[in-house]
């Protein structure tokens, strides 16, 4: 069972829930104060504006007792995935290295993007090496940065690219270091991503009927 943790200000929990059900993954939405890590094989921290994004995006949620429990789950090898604001929570809590800074042009960005799978050894991307997928982003603080370039190169999972998989500054929507859209820990069980797979999981609501989000989410089935 995968727990979708809802903090005050989380807004995407229902979309993630419906997408996981569509992907055949057993899941439940859990309020952060009610979270019991012993009941779940993994967690997803969905998008939104946890605790109003006061101080910094994700910083207050990162300091909760709930995230201490999530950290222990990660250390135990269980799945921890952060989407958008969830990714911000993961870096603020130290589960992933780096920071998510305001977009380079200081504007909220909402658009569909192409992504190249760089690491095919994570829970979500096994067997997808160099595959090009398409999902939407929607954020104001999604510019990934880390002061360790070697870490960035070895831990990035997805990079922003064009439809042919070419990676350049021209297709970097927010100024992220090395066009990074997603990173994971060395073990591949803790993954943070700015794109929203849940918004690319239904033909009716996806651009051109794209359901590439399901390609990633279905891989959670063997763990749930």
Curated annotation (Swiss-Prot):
It is found in: Cytoplasm. Pathway: Purine metabolism; IMP biosynthesis via de novo pathway; 5-amino-1-(5-phospho-D-ribosyl)imidazole from N(2)-formyl-N(1)-(5-phospho-D-ribosyl)glycinamide: step 1/2. Pfam families: GATase_5. Its EC number is 6.3.5.3, 3.5.1.2. PROSITE patterns: GATASE_TYPE_1 (PS51273). Part of the FGAM synthase complex composed of 1 PurL, 1 PurQ and 2 PurS subunits. Keywords: ATP-binding, Cytoplasm, Glutamine amidotransferase, Hydrolase, Ligase, Nucleotide-binding, Purine biosynthesis. Residues 1-224 form the Glutamine amidotransferase type-1 domain. GO terms for biological process: 'de novo' IMP biosynthetic process. The active site is at 84 (nucleophile), 196, 198. It comes from the Archaea. NCBIfam families: FGAM_synth_I (TIGR01737), PRK03619.1 (NF002957). It catalyses: N(2)-formyl-N(1)-(5-phospho-beta-D-ribosyl)glycinamide + L-glutamine + ATP + H2O = 2-formamido-N(1)-(5-O-phospho-beta-D-ribosyl)acetamidine + L-glutamate + ADP + phosphate + H(+); L-glutamine + H2O = L-glutamate + NH4(+). GO terms for cellular component: cytoplasm. SMART domains: GATase_5 (SM01211). One of its GO terms (molecular function) is ATP binding. Part of the phosphoribosylformylglycinamidine synthase complex involved in the purines biosynthetic pathway. Catalyzes the ATP-dependent conversion of formylglycinamide ribonucleotide (FGAR) and glutamine to yield formylglycinamidine ribonucleotide (FGAM) and glutamate. The FGAM synthase complex is composed of three subunits. PurQ produces an ammonia molecule by converting glutamine to glutamate. PurL transfers the ammonia molecule to FGAR to form FGAM in an ATP-dependent manner. The keyword ATP-binding applies. This is Phosphoribosylformylglycinamidine synthase subunit PurQ. InterPro entries: Class_I_gatase-like, PRibForGlyAmidine_synth_PurQ.
């Amino acid at each position: 069972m995968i727990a979708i943790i809802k903090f005050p200000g989380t807004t995407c929990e229902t979309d993630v829930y419906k997408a996981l059900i569509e992907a055949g993954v057993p899941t439940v939405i859990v309020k952060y104060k009610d979270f019991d890590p012993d009941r779940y094989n993994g967690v997803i921290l969905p998008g939104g504006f946890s605790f109003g994004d006061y101080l910094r995006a994700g910083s207050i949620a990162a300091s909760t007792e709930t995230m201490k429990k999530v950290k222990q789950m990660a250390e135990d090898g269980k799945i921890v995935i952060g989407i958008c604001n969830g990714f911000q929570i993961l870096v603020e809590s130290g589960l992933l290295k780096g920071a998510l800074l305001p977009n380079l042009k200081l504007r909220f960005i909402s658009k569909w993007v192409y992504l190249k799978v760089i690491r095919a050894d994570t829970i979500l991307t096994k067997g997808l090496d160099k595959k090009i997928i398409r999902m939407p982003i929607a954020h104001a603080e999604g510019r990934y940065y880390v002061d360790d370039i070697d870490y960035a190169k070895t831990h990035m999972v997805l990079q922003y690219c064009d439809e042919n998989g070419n990676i350049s500054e021209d297709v970097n929507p927010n100024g992220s270091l090395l066009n990074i859209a997603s990173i994971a820990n060395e073990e591949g069980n803790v993954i943070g991503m700015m794109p929203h797979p849940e918004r690319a999981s239904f033909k009716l609501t996806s651009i051109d009927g794209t359901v590439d989000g399901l390609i990633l989410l279905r891989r959670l089935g063997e763990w749930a």
